[in-house]
Structures are given as C-alpha cells and as structure tokens.
Amino acid sequence: MTRQYSLDLLEKIQEKQETINVQGAEVLVKNIPDCDEKGAMDPRLYKDMKVQMNIMRFMPKNMMKMDASEKSVKNMRKQFNGIKSVPIVTKDINITNETVKTEDGYDIPIRIYNSISKRENAPILYFIHGGGFMAGSPDVVEELVKLIVEKTDILAVSVDYRLAPEHPYPIGHTDCYTTLKWIYENAEAFGGDKNNIFVAGDSAGGNLTQYCTTRDMEDGRNLVKGQLLLYPTINMCDYEDEFYSWSIDKYEIAPKYKKGLEKLLNVMHSMAGGMAEILGTQDIHSKYLSPYVDVNPDYPCTFITVGEHDFLMIECLAYAAKLTKKGVDTETVLYRGLGHAYGDNVGVYPQSEDLAIEMGNFILKHSRK
C-alpha cells in the first residue's frame, strides 16, 4: 500500500524543524509541514478528530471516565486496539514468533523482526506497546517497528505482555522486564548484539520501558544501552515540582480548535486518574509507576517525543528538563499540531515516518558509542 501523503511533506518536516530551549532542555521542534498557523492542528489529524471533538463538547462528564468496570475496559479496548497504520515497508521483514517463560509458568508471546539485509551483530530495538495498561497489542505498533527495521537494518523484538485489570500490577511490568532479560540471554542466537539493546515504548509502554530500565539498574545488570519514550505516562500521581504543574493554559491552541481541544485535553488529563483502579493498586506514587518522582542521574541515553496537543505534553517536557538537569543524555522531539499516539499512524501521517527516522538515528548513533 502507498503512503497517504507526498514524500515532499516528509522533507518539509525536516526543512522546517527548529531547536528551542524548554526549562533548560534542548527540544527539537517539528513544525507542521503544510501549515504555519501557531497552535493549529495538523490537517490530517483534524480531519480524523473533527467529529470526535464536536461530540465531546456536548458529552456529560459521567460518560467520559476510565475505570476497571467491564463496560469501560471493553470500550477502551475497542478504541485502543484499532490498527490505523497502513503498510509502506517494501523490504522483506522476517517475523518469528517465540515465547518467554515467566516465573509463574506463563508463556509471554514475543515477535522478532529481522530484515533480509540485517547488519551483522545488529543493535536490538525492544518495543513495548501502549494502551493504558489494559489494551493495545503488538499489532497496533507493528508498522512502526517494521519501518524502523527497514530504515536501519537492526533487529527488533515486540512483546505481548499480560494486561490489567485481569492481570493487576505488577504482572504486566514484570512480563516486560522478564522479556528484556530473555532478549539479552538469547540475542546471539538470533543475530543480535546483547550489548546494544534499546528499549522503547509508547504511552503506557513508555512507563513499562522506564520500569525495565530502572529495574535493570537496580539489579546491576546494565542490559539497557538506551531508552526511547514515546509520549510516555511517567507522572501517574500528578506530582508537582519546579518543572511540572498541569494547566490547560500551557497549551497553544488556535481559535478554530480551542473549544474542542481544550475539552479533549481536560477530559484525557482527568481520565488518567483512573489508572490506579485499572492497575489494581494504590501505589501510583512509587518510582515504578511515577518515575518522574525519582529520577536517577545514571539513566542511559534517553529519547523522548510528544505532540504539542497531547494531554501528556506538559509532563513529558518536564521529564526531559528534569533528566537534563540530572545530567542524563536526553534528546527530545516535539511535533507541532499533533496529539497522542502518532506512532500508530505510519503511512497516514508524515510525522509518523519522521518519528521512525528519528528513532532509528538515535539507536544507530548511540550503538556506536
């Protein structure tokens, strides 16, 4: 299938990018390729979101909540499990299915992605999907993973960890960490470099990624060469400090989109409060669920990306600033005009392909160090 945009737009994104400073952190800003209006939504995203935003303007608050009820989980899974990307990868990518045995005897399904032109002793991207800890699957992010593999000739592994609320915290988290250890132990068998493992995840997967890195450091294994956090959930307890406090006034929104976007952002921010119930724990202040609270200066190199109109934008940029202040080698990319989960739109939004390029460049650059 062909891209739903011209490659000229991809080039425009790179031509129009600029660097700004946000609370001491250097941020690479990717402007909308075909719109210069400040605070505008990307026209492709607006086309997809217009009806939803209009509906939300008149929807009562009691209909906009996220909890562990069967109805809520079913609705969230229906929303998060849809595949929005279209295939644009032309290189043959071999996909191998394996399982990883947990301490309680469960077999975690994983997928290994291997291009026909794979590098010898290739760096490994270990990707953990998002979905609010209770939805999503490797299918949703598969085109992003395959695109990175195509552009870099590295190896990739994705994991289908157990989901809440059926499997409460920390089961999903430990599944992901168990898989990380398996990748290290078996890397050479599938042609990967165990000393160049990069863990990545989107949204809730970003939280799971940071968990893997933190546990890896605590256990003294040092398996993680770098981490890539795509619009991650890293401040579940909404902890405020010199870098972070959430306010709708911190969003730049053009008048045309203001009512709809402000309602959407406020709702999404308030819905995040239901995470404790979904995960089956009240321990959301811990460094594992809210890593923003306790930043370790010894974290490996970190890549962060977030959209200008993402409800997590404020905490993601605050996290980048906090990591930078602690001395962590941090690269941050902000996409103007986008919201949440644009990694799920490969072949549809040019920014999704640009993200794959940025992630690949980060991995290749740091794997040489």
Annotate the PLM regions:
Residues T2-M41, N94-K369:
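Alpha/beta-hydrolase superfamily serine-hydrolase fold, recognizing
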Residues I83-E98:
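A domain-start/cap signature at the N-terminus of enzymes
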